[in-house]
Protein backbone atom coordinates (compact mmCIF):
# COMPACT_ATOMS: atom_id res chain seq x y z
CA UNK A 1 0.00 0.00 0.00
CA UNK A 2 2.77 2.42 0.85
CA UNK A 3 4.73 1.86 -2.35
CA UNK A 4 1.52 2.20 -4.34
CA UNK A 5 0.99 5.60 -2.76
CA UNK A 6 4.64 6.57 -3.14
CA UNK A 7 6.69 4.54 -5.66
CA UNK A 8 9.87 6.32 -4.52
CA UNK A 9 9.51 5.34 -0.87
CA UNK A 10 12.45 4.03 1.18
CA UNK A 11 10.97 2.18 4.14
CA UNK A 12 12.98 0.87 7.11
CA UNK A 13 11.58 -1.17 9.98
CA UNK A 14 13.31 -2.09 13.26
CA UNK A 15 12.35 -5.22 15.18
CA UNK A 16 13.75 -6.91 18.25
CA UNK A 17 14.90 -10.25 16.83
CA UNK A 18 14.01 -10.14 13.12
CA UNK A 19 10.84 -11.36 11.45
CA UNK A 20 11.35 -15.12 11.87
CA UNK A 21 12.42 -17.57 14.57
CA UNK A 22 11.28 -18.53 18.08
CA UNK A 23 12.21 -15.13 19.56
CA UNK A 24 9.82 -13.31 17.23
CA UNK A 25 7.10 -12.71 19.87
CA UNK A 26 9.53 -11.65 22.59
CA UNK A 27 9.82 -7.96 23.57
CA UNK A 28 12.59 -6.15 21.73
CA UNK A 29 14.22 -4.14 24.51
CA UNK A 30 17.84 -3.07 24.91
CA UNK A 31 18.70 -4.86 28.17
CA UNK A 32 16.90 -8.03 27.12
CA UNK A 33 18.70 -8.16 23.77
CA UNK A 34 22.05 -7.46 25.43
CA UNK A 35 21.38 -10.39 27.75
CA UNK A 36 20.32 -12.68 24.89
CA UNK A 37 23.34 -11.82 22.73
CA UNK A 38 26.12 -12.86 25.12
CA UNK A 39 27.54 -9.37 25.45
CA UNK A 40 26.99 -9.19 29.23
CA UNK A 41 29.76 -11.75 29.83
CA UNK A 42 32.44 -9.56 28.24
CA UNK A 43 33.28 -7.71 31.46
CA UNK A 44 33.15 -8.12 35.22
CA UNK A 45 34.51 -10.83 37.50
CA UNK A 46 34.36 -14.62 37.36
CA UNK A 47 32.10 -14.88 40.39
CA UNK A 48 30.19 -11.68 39.65
CA UNK A 49 26.96 -10.98 37.85
CA UNK A 50 26.83 -10.54 34.06
CA UNK A 51 27.65 -6.93 33.21
CA UNK A 52 25.27 -5.05 30.88
CA UNK A 53 26.22 -1.78 29.26
CA UNK A 54 24.80 1.13 31.30
CA UNK A 55 23.99 3.05 28.13
CA UNK A 56 21.46 1.84 25.56
CA UNK A 57 24.13 0.44 23.26
CA UNK A 58 21.80 -1.91 21.35
CA UNK A 59 19.31 0.86 20.58
CA UNK A 60 22.13 3.15 19.45
CA UNK A 61 23.70 0.50 17.21
CA UNK A 62 20.33 -0.37 15.66
CA UNK A 63 19.56 3.29 14.98
CA UNK A 64 22.88 3.64 13.14
CA UNK A 65 22.08 0.52 11.12
CA UNK A 66 18.70 2.01 10.25
CA UNK A 67 20.33 5.27 9.12
CA UNK A 68 22.78 3.34 6.93
CA UNK A 69 19.90 1.30 5.51
CA UNK A 70 18.07 4.49 4.55
CA UNK A 71 21.15 5.89 2.81
CA UNK A 72 21.77 2.62 0.95
CA UNK A 73 18.08 2.48 0.06
CA UNK A 74 18.16 5.97 -1.41
CA UNK A 75 21.11 5.02 -3.61
CA UNK A 76 19.40 1.84 -4.78
CA UNK A 77 16.14 3.67 -5.47
CA UNK A 78 17.87 6.40 -7.45
CA UNK A 79 19.89 3.91 -9.51
CA UNK A 80 17.16 1.35 -10.16
CA UNK A 81 14.03 3.48 -9.91
CA UNK A 82 12.30 1.14 -7.45
CA UNK A 83 10.95 1.54 -3.92
CA UNK A 84 13.09 -0.04 -1.20
CA UNK A 85 12.25 -1.86 2.02
CA UNK A 86 15.01 -2.58 4.55
CA UNK A 87 14.77 -4.54 7.79
CA UNK A 88 16.90 -3.93 10.87
CA UNK A 89 16.81 -5.78 14.19
CA UNK A 90 18.22 -5.02 17.62
CA UNK A 91 19.76 -8.50 17.71
CA UNK A 92 21.55 -8.09 14.38
CA UNK A 93 22.90 -4.73 15.53
CA UNK A 94 24.42 -6.04 18.77
CA UNK A 95 25.85 -9.08 16.96
CA UNK A 96 27.47 -6.77 14.42
CA UNK A 97 29.27 -4.72 17.09
CA UNK A 98 30.50 -7.97 18.67
CA UNK A 99 31.85 -9.31 15.38
CA UNK A 100 35.43 -9.46 16.69
CA UNK A 101 34.49 -11.39 19.82
CA UNK A 102 31.98 -13.75 18.18
CA UNK A 103 34.19 -14.65 15.22
CA UNK A 104 37.12 -15.26 17.57
CA UNK A 105 34.96 -17.64 19.59
CA UNK A 106 33.59 -19.42 16.53
CA UNK A 107 37.00 -19.87 14.91
CA UNK A 108 39.00 -20.82 18.02
CA UNK A 109 36.44 -22.03 20.55
CA UNK A 110 37.87 -19.58 23.08
CA UNK A 111 35.88 -17.02 25.03
CA UNK A 112 36.84 -13.91 26.94
CA UNK A 113 38.00 -14.89 30.43
CA UNK A 114 36.60 -12.91 33.31
CA UNK A 115 38.85 -12.99 36.37
CA UNK A 116 39.05 -12.05 40.04
CA UNK A 117 39.59 -8.39 39.14
CA UNK A 118 36.84 -6.30 37.50
CA UNK A 119 38.23 -6.34 33.97
CA UNK A 120 36.95 -3.65 31.62
CA UNK A 121 37.07 -6.35 28.94
CA UNK A 122 37.36 -10.10 29.33
CA UNK A 123 39.31 -10.21 26.05
CA UNK A 124 42.05 -7.63 26.59
CA UNK A 125 45.54 -7.90 28.01
CA UNK A 126 46.01 -6.39 31.48
CA UNK A 127 46.01 -3.78 32.80
CA UNK A 128 43.18 -2.72 30.46
CA UNK A 129 40.74 -1.15 32.93
CA UNK A 130 40.02 1.57 35.47
CA UNK A 131 42.00 2.12 38.67
CA UNK A 132 41.51 4.41 41.67
CA UNK A 133 43.93 7.17 42.66
CA UNK A 134 44.05 9.51 45.65
CA UNK A 135 41.66 11.94 44.00
CA UNK A 136 39.81 10.03 41.29
CA UNK A 137 40.36 7.33 38.71
CA UNK A 138 42.65 6.55 35.79
CA UNK A 139 41.76 4.45 32.74
CA UNK A 140 44.55 2.46 31.11
CA UNK A 141 44.14 0.99 27.62
CA UNK A 142 46.50 -1.25 25.59
CA UNK A 143 49.91 -0.49 27.06
CA UNK A 144 53.33 -1.92 27.84
CA UNK A 145 53.47 -3.36 31.35
CA UNK A 146 57.20 -2.67 31.42
CA UNK A 147 56.63 1.02 30.69
CA UNK A 148 53.95 1.26 33.36
CA UNK A 149 56.21 -0.52 35.86
CA UNK A 150 58.99 1.97 35.19
CA UNK A 151 56.74 5.01 35.65
CA UNK A 152 55.20 3.60 38.83
CA UNK A 153 58.57 2.34 40.11
CA UNK A 154 57.06 -1.08 40.78
CA UNK A 155 59.41 -4.06 40.96
CA UNK A 156 56.42 -6.40 41.27
CA UNK A 157 54.95 -5.12 38.04
CA UNK A 158 58.30 -5.25 36.26
CA UNK A 159 58.61 -8.92 37.23
CA UNK A 160 55.09 -9.65 35.98
CA UNK A 161 55.90 -7.89 32.70
CA UNK A 162 58.66 -10.42 32.00
CA UNK A 163 56.73 -13.50 33.12
CA UNK A 164 53.73 -13.52 30.79
CA UNK A 165 52.72 -17.15 30.10
CA UNK A 166 52.35 -18.67 26.67
CA UNK A 167 49.08 -17.53 25.01
CA UNK A 168 48.01 -21.15 24.60
CA UNK A 169 48.13 -21.85 28.34
CA UNK A 170 44.74 -20.50 29.36
CA UNK A 171 44.99 -21.45 33.04
CA UNK A 172 48.42 -19.87 33.52
CA UNK A 173 47.44 -16.81 31.51
CA UNK A 174 44.34 -16.29 33.63
CA UNK A 175 46.37 -16.59 36.84
CA UNK A 176 48.85 -14.05 35.48
CA UNK A 177 46.11 -11.62 34.48
CA UNK A 178 44.57 -11.86 37.95
CA UNK A 179 47.97 -11.07 39.46
CA UNK A 180 48.57 -7.96 37.33
CA UNK A 181 45.48 -5.94 38.21
CA UNK A 182 45.92 -5.71 42.00
CA UNK A 183 49.60 -4.80 41.60
CA UNK A 184 48.73 -1.93 39.25
CA UNK A 185 45.99 -0.81 41.62
CA UNK A 186 48.33 -0.94 44.61
CA UNK A 187 50.83 1.26 42.79
CA UNK A 188 48.26 3.80 41.57
CA UNK A 189 46.16 4.19 44.71
CA UNK A 190 48.50 6.62 46.55
CA UNK A 191 49.14 8.78 43.47
CA UNK A 192 47.26 11.87 42.20
CA UNK A 193 45.44 11.56 38.89
CA UNK A 194 46.71 14.54 36.89
CA UNK A 195 50.45 14.17 37.42
CA UNK A 196 50.27 10.39 37.06
CA UNK A 197 48.45 10.64 33.74
CA UNK A 198 51.11 13.12 32.58
CA UNK A 199 53.92 10.75 33.59
CA UNK A 200 52.28 7.76 31.93
CA UNK A 201 51.59 9.84 28.80
CA UNK A 202 55.27 10.77 28.59
CA UNK A 203 56.16 7.07 28.68
CA UNK A 204 53.80 6.28 25.81
CA UNK A 205 51.17 4.62 27.98
CA UNK A 206 47.63 4.99 26.65
CA UNK A 207 45.69 6.38 29.58
CA UNK A 208 43.43 9.16 30.74
CA UNK A 209 41.42 10.49 33.65
CA UNK A 210 37.95 9.11 34.30
CA UNK A 211 35.58 12.07 34.21
CA UNK A 212 32.06 12.82 35.35
CA UNK A 213 29.53 14.62 33.16
CA UNK A 214 30.39 17.86 34.99
CA UNK A 215 34.08 17.30 34.23
CA UNK A 216 33.23 16.63 30.60
CA UNK A 217 31.10 19.75 30.21
CA UNK A 218 33.80 21.93 31.78
CA UNK A 219 36.60 20.49 29.64
CA UNK A 220 37.94 22.82 26.90
CA UNK A 221 37.81 20.04 24.27
Q: Language-model segments: which ranges?
A:
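Active-site-adjacent capping/gating segments
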Residues: 117, 124, 215-221
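Aromatic-enriched alpha-helical interface/lid elements that frame and gate functional surfaces
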Residues: 122, 126-207, 214
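A structured beta-alpha segment of the ubiquitous adenosine-cofactor-binding alpha/beta core
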Residues: 1-4, 189
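Active-site-adjacent "lid/gating" segments in soluble enzymes
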Residues: 3-143, 150
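Acidic-histidine catalytic/liganding microenvironments
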Residues: 6, 154, 219
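Short, solvent-exposed turn/loop segments enriched in Gly/Ser/Thr/Pro and often Arg
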Residues: 15-18, 213-219
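Short secondary-structure transition/capping segments
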Residues: 24-25, 170-172, 219-221
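Proline-centered helix-kink/hinge sites
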Residues: 7, 206-209
Amino acid sequence: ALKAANPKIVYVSISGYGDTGPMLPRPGQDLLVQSFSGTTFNAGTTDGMPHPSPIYIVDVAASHNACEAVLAGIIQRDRRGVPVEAKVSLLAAVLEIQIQEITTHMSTGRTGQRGSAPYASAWMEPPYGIFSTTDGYIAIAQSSLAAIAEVLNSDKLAELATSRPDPGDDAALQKWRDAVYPVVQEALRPLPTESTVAALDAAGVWCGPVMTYDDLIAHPQ
